Every structure is written in structure tokens, then in C-alpha cells.
Amino acid sequence: PTISTLKELKKSGYKTESIKDELKRNLTQVLKAGKKTFEKIHGYENSVIPQLERAILAGHNINFLGLRGQAKTRLARQMVNLLDEWIPVIKGSEINDDPISPISSKGKEIIKNLGDKTEIDWIHRNERFYEKLATPDVSVADLIGDLDPIKAASLKLSYSDERVIHFGMIPRANRCIFVVNELPDLQARIQVSLFSILEEKEIQIRGFKLRIPLDIQFVFTANPEDYTNRGSIVTPLKDRIGSQILTHYPLSINIAKKITKQESNISPDDKKNILIPEVAKDLVEQINFIARSSEYVDAKSGISTRTVSYTHLR
């Protein structure tokens, strides 16, 4: 984009839009055009994908509930394709402030000082995807942020002042898609912090509350069986996740073979030298299907669809 100042942006007719409305608008256009919304996802055409489309149209935060290897994260990543290619942000903003309606004190200060001369940066949709694997050692500082005592002392500011906060991943993902994988593994107190962001539009750091209306599309993933024995989703947070979508393994061997063929990474030279009979491919996939119903395999942790190793055998 050639627009570089706030004045030019206003002249272009740009209007502020939430990320959920942006996703909804672009998804509606894709559906009207009869195009495929999620590419290279097999076996979900009549189950998971329609539910995901409805969740996006409803403006919900989403939780994918399923076992390992069921394309939960891949679906979340492909939601990026439903974002606008470029969005404007205030140059120098830490949390991707919208030039028309900034939410951070720094963004507001820049607009106040420079007015229409405020410089504009542009962010590509591929940069608007954040992902965090939830583990028990993830802290509030990692996700939400922490107070910077050195900054507070040097600027002579109170700890309750927004300017002394070093923002974590979630505030920096403002106007982006934020994925939390394995949500139940997050400590309960951090899940409560997420609840505050979803419900109250405020962040809490070391007892200080700060109201910042963050604009984020949250996507969570979780396993239906708590095979990690580490925790669960706290009820208040669960109630604020608008759509819970159950994923599943391929329902037929043909779909499983299609996934394996797509995911296997075989060089052109190897393809010339190696021939894998169809019956061998069927047998490998059949082993997966049998394992999922076998009493000798712990089905709670899932039998992944990632059976691509046989394609590399010599």
C-alpha cells in the first residue's frame, strides 16, 4: 500500500472494523463466490468445516475439541486467509493500534501530537497469526505482560500507569488471530486472566487492572480426555467460548490415504525409484483404524493420522 500518513488514510475512506467482522465479511464473500474456504483439509467437508463457518459468521471465539493429529491447528492457521491482505497500524505502536481508533496510551499520544501527519505502517495478514502452546510453566508475564520497575522509576510513573507495562503476547496480538494449543494445560489463574480479557475487556497484572478493549479472534484447542492429567478448562472461561467444535479422525481409508499422500514429503527422484503398491497403503491405514478400536492401545491419547513414515521406507 502507498498510503503513509493518517491524512491519506482518511481520504481513502478507510473505516475501522473489528477482526471478527473482517473474518465474517470475507467468509461471506468466499461463500457467495462458491469457493472452498479451507484448502487441503480432507474429511471435514460435511462436519467440522460447516460448523467452523457458522462460528465465524456468528463472531464467536472457538474451541476445537479433539485428539492429536486431527488438523485442529491447521484449521486455525487457515483462518488467516479470511483476513484482509493488509491493515494499517500506527507506526511505533506496540499493540497494532488502529490509526482511526487507537486503544493504547502510546497510540493516542502519537495521534494527539502528530494529528494527520501520523505515520502509518501496514501489516500483512500472514503476520496476524500468533500461536502459543499451553504448558504448566507459562506465566501471566508471557501471555499478558508485566510491570517494568526500571521504566517506572526512570519516568517517575505509578505502577498503575499503562506506560510502565511490558506487554505480553496477547496484547501484541491485537487485531490478530491468537491460538492457544492445549488450553487445559494452562494454570487456572492464567485461564481466569483470559476470561477477564474475553468478558471484561481488561487485563490484570500484579493486582493492577487496566481496561484495554483488545480486538482478538481467539482460537483454542483441547483434548476431550485429559490424558495429560494436568488440568481442565475453568467453567467461567468455558462459558465465554462461543463455539465448541468436535474434530474427528478420517471416517474412511480412502480419506486417510489422501491425507497421507498430501503430507508425505517425497522427492521426485525417490518417486521414480520407489513403488508402493496400493495394498500396502491400504494396510498401513487399516492398522491405524484397528489401533483406534483396540483394547491394547490407549485411545484416550489418540492414534494420529500422521502415518506418513511408510512412504520413506526403502
Residue ranges of predicted features:
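Conserved C-terminal "switch" segment of AAA+ ATPases
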Residues: 16-24, 230, 244-303
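Structural motif
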Residues: 43-44, 300-307
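Conserved small/polar residues in nucleotide/adenosyl-binding loops
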Residues: 311-312
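Short functional linear motifs
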Residues: 49, 191, 238, 271, ...
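Conserved ASCE/P-loop NTPase catalytic core
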Residues: 1-252
